[in-house]
């Protein structure tokens, strides 16, 4: 009886399934595929802007002898590194940041969160080697502020530079020109800068997924940025004007959370018209891939931060959640249509030419769904110097919504722990 109903109403069923598949492809194009080339465009724009800024500074320096009061040089920069127990990683990072080929003045401020003995000894040794290195620490007193928030805040307050760049201890600059290229984008019309950071590939499935997540997050933020919206910030490789940080109250809005300080600050206070995105490899940081538990904790933290957003930022992330389901829904609808058509022809023993137009449309939808996800991100992945995921992108897209549900469940289960609490010094 069910089969008789399907065959008698197949025109309506087929039309509905193909229209539903087309709707999913349209959503994918509008909310994802159309913006996957933005990163490549931003790399080109950044390189052009850096070239102009370099030429401008060279002209200023060349005419400095004739015009004494002509502004010249690059801004003073303080690189703040919040560190807890990462002594080995910090030992690898410090020579990279202390030996930057920067034409201006800069310093490195290490904010010691936990006052670990190994970290303290390491900082003492490096302080004797380089006059650029300064240290500060979180005082051993009762406090209700998460350690990283307090460490970054103390580092910013201790900074003597006009600009502060926050980087993690497990990251490494792309080259000795990293700071110079970064500084060329710290212009007077900007208060907040987000640089690109991604994990070093290790060949594992979790690493490949984590790298793809950060690329997709960057693309989402660039799409929102094109419409005047700032969607959060990564944990590392962001720069802020020190006076701006003080004027907006720093991390005041995220004090009740044990994470999300830079994310919430960027969403609430960063003006898109005074914010810049740096995507070029020259200003990139490469981060050591953390453990799976750390990656999961970061995903849960980001999910909780997104839940607390409002206004346009909330709608953008809701759109991301909707489009995440489109590949699965498309696969379901087009597979159902194909299965029904095969079953109908198998029962009759001949191909029904009356459905040729429908079959051509279904085949076209399959081609679009299979090849467009492979082709669209090629330019951006090449510009970001990331390896193209290849066929893995199909698996990633199909698993993404289910992983989002899993992270949301973890977030709900752990939400009672997302409160400001007393932090003993033994942490």
Each predicted region: which residue ranges?
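Catalytic donor/gating beta->alpha subdomain of glycosyltransferases that bind UDP-sugars
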Residues: 192-217, 246, 252-317, 423
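N-terminal membrane-anchoring/stem segments of glycan-assembly enzymes
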Residues: 1-68, 377, 404
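Membrane-embedded multi-pass helical conduit in multi-pass membrane proteins
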Residues: 324-415
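Long helical/loop segments within the catalytic core of UDP-sugar-dependent glycosyltransferases
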Residues: 137-147, 151, 155, 181-252, ...
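Acidic donor-binding segment of Leloir-type glycosyltransferases
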Residues: 95-142
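Short aromatic/hydrophobic "clamp" motif used to bind/position activated sugar donors
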Residues: 164
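Cell-envelope/extracellular polymer assembly enzymes that use nucleotide-activated donors
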Residues: 75-78, 107
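Acidic donor-binding/catalytic loop of UDP-sugar-dependent glycosyltransferases
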Residues: 168-184
């Amino acid at each position: 009886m069910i089969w008789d109903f399907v065959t008698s109403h197949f025109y309506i069923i087929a039309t509905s399934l193909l229209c539903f598949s087309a709707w999913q492809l349209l959503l994918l194009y509008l909310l994802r595929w159309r913006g996957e080339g933005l990163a490549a465009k931003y790399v080109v724009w950044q390189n052009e802007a850096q070239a102009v800024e370099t030429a401008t500074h060279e002209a200023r320096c060349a005419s400095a002898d004739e015009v004494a009061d002509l502004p010249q040089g690059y801004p003073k920069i303080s690189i703040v590194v919040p560190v807890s127990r990462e002594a080995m990683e910090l030992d690898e990072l410090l020579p990279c940041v202390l030996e930057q080929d920067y034409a201006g003045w800069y310093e490195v401020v290490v904010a010691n969160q936990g006052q670990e003995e190994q970290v303290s000894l390491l900082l003492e040794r490096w302080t004797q080697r380089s006059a650029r290195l300064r240290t500060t620490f979180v005082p051993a007193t009762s406090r209700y502020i998460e350690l990283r928030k307090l460490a970054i805040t103390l580092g910013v307050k201790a900074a003597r530079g006009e600009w502060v760049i926050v980087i993690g201890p497990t990251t490494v600059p792309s080259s000795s020109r990293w700071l110079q290229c970064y500084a060329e984008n710290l212009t007077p019309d900007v208060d907040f800068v987000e640089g690109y950071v991604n994990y070093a590939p290790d060949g594992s499935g979790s690493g490949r997924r984590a790298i793809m997540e950060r690329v997709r997050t960057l693309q989402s933020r660039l799409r929102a940025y094109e419409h005047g919206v700032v969607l959060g910030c990564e944990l590392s490789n962001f720069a802020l004007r020190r006076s701006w940080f003080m004027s907006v109250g720093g991390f005041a809005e995220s004090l009740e959370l044990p994470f999300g300080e830079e994310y919430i600050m960027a969403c609430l206070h960063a003006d898109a018209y005074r914010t810049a995105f740096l995507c070029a490899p020259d200003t990139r940081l490469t981060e050591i891939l953390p453990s799976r538990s750390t990656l999961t904790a970061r995903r849960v933290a980001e999910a909780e931060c997104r839940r607390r957003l409002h206004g346009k930022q909330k709608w953008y992330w809701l759109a991301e959640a909707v489009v995440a389901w489109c590949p699965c829904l498309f696969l379901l609808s087009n597979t159902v249509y194909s299965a029904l058509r095969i079953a109908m022809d198998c029962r009759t023993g001949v191909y029904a030419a009356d459905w040729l137009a429908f079959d051509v449309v279904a085949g076209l939808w399959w081609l679009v769904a299979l090849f467009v996800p492979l082709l669209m991100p090629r330019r951006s992945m090449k510009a970001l110097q990331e390896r193209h995921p290849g066929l893995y992108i199909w698996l990633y897209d199909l698993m993404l919504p289910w992983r989002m549900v899993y992270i949301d469940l973890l977030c709900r289960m752990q939400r009672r722990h997302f409160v400001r609490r007393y932090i003993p010094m033994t942490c």
